[in-house]
């Protein structure tokens, strides 16, 4: 099993934790990570694009002029696509871009993302993460003590409102619960910081 130092909020080492190699020590599968990121980004698309077809645009259904004898090209409706203001042919309509990956693939993607962070030495474990009150200044101090200057993802076992409120105004910092971790956020942050209890919860769910 891989051993990782456990840090306090002040950055001091307070012990070690053994990570489950079946979750944090596998060979990252880049193809699965790619599929997971594409699927998650697809589900974030709004899909509310819409244009009007010839049955929806303004204008009567009357034939604009008689078929023959005018010298002009024959026309059946001013709502035809070749007219200015006419309907669009085969235009976009509202749709959902989301699709689900198989459960085994989703689990493998999470394990691959977590293992990649451990291999890159961008995975930190805190003994605990608690704040007496929602104070952005206090959370900024924690970032400084842990030498976290780039985008950082904090993962707690359960929702802690004081922690979430303290971090929400800090650019590049995201706080999630262990049940809410996802591949896009794991890969989208330089550093990933788990509490000890969050590690145990993830190992329980993915183990």
Swiss-Prot record:
GO biological process: translation
Ribosomal protein as UniProt keyword: yes
Highest taxon above the source species: Bacteria
Region of interest: Disordered: 48-81
A GO term for molecular function: structural constituent of ribosome
Sequence intervals crossing the membrane: none
Quaternary assembly: Part of the 50S ribosomal subunit.
Function: One of the primary rRNA binding proteins, this protein initially binds near the 5'-end of the 23S rRNA. It is important during the early stages of 50S assembly. It makes multiple contacts with different domains of the 23S rRNA in the assembled 50S subunit and ribosome.
NCBIfam families found in the cross-reference section: rplD_bact (TIGR03953)
Protein known as: Large ribosomal subunit protein uL4
This protein's encoding gene: rplD
